[in-house]
Structures are given as C-alpha cells and as structure tokens.
C-alpha cells in the first residue's frame, strides 16, 4: 500500500534573535506542534477518552456503594468532602420509627452491606453521535439487603424497641455474612441522558444500582 497524505498545512513560526542564537516563542511552538501532531495524537486521545469513561462509571459505582470518593470527586469537580457528603445524603437515613439507640448501628450495618457489593466495568464501546457509549458491567447481585428484610418481616415483635433491635440485628447478620445471586453481565448506556437521569425511576443507572443491590 502507498502512504496516504492529507492536505498541506503551512505553519508560521515566530523566531527571535537572542544574542548569538535564535529562539522560538512558546506560543508559536505550541501552535506548530498542535498542527503537526494532531493526527498523530488523535488515536491516543480516543483511547484515553474511552478509558476515562470506564473510570468514571467505576468511580461512580465505588462512590455510591463504598464511599470511595477520590476518583469520583476528580470526575465531577467536587472536593472529596463534597463527594462524601453526596454519598452520605439520604442513603443511610434510618426509618423514622427506629429507636435512637439503634441509629448508628443501623447506618454502620447498611454501609458494610453496600461496601461488599461486587461489580466490574468493561471497556466502553463508542456509538454514533457525540458523547455516546455502551459498556458491559459484570455484577454479582448482593442480595443481603432484600434477604435481611425478608427475614426480619417473618419475626414477631411486641414493642418499638423489639422492632428496632430485630431490624438492626438482622442487618448486622447479613453485613457479617452477605448473600449473593448469580453473576450476570448487562450492557449499560453512558451518555448525557443516562447521566442526567441517574437516580430516577427506571433510569439506566438506577436499574444498574438495583441489580447490584436489590431492595
């Protein structure tokens, strides 16, 4: 095969005499390199973009389920403190009837269940139309929460304190020994619509979260 060439591009470099030598201004050199290396770097840029999308979804899941917010903060221009506050908001609010003495144990048990969720993100595939990708996500459903609630509801309780103690003890049991379903792989779209609708009923990322941790 013969080499293929694109249209000729003429660049103008600003060269100034500096004593006995000549120097090219930084701005002029940057402009030249951006023209000369654009096509050379484009394949690398495309790969970096794909890996960045994969890292974003992985960091979103890690922040949502495990409170690991460092990478998620970088992707969302939040501070780590702001990302951690996002993780804490509402997720661990106990039932209003729960006795005050059990609130912290409830939160700790729920966090421990969520931290043991199992998932991994695959390499994204670029689809037509700008920022538009699909990605395989492999999930081992963490059935601990739904199993804990089913077990708790089978008990008999005679006071609010017994209800609180029973709920927390059951959650702690499954936090110590999680239960899992069968491994499955789902194809998840990652685009502006899926990101904007995250958290809404039947949204793609909401459905993914419910697959990871059924409720």
Which residues does each predicted region cover?
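Core segments of small alpha/beta cavity-forming domains
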Residues: 1, 36-112, 119
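Surface-exposed, charged secondary-structure patches
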Residues: 1-2, 97-167
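Short beta-strand edge/turn micro-motifs at domain boundaries
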Residues: 2-48, 156-162, 176-215
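Generic local-structure boundary detector
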Residues: 33-35, 40-43, 71, 75, ...
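Solvent-exposed, well-ordered amphipathic alpha-helical segments
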Residues: 72, 127-134, 187-196
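Beta-strand-rich interaction surfaces with strong enrichment in secreted/lumenal proteins
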Residues: 122-123, 174-178
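A short, charged
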Residues: 165-175
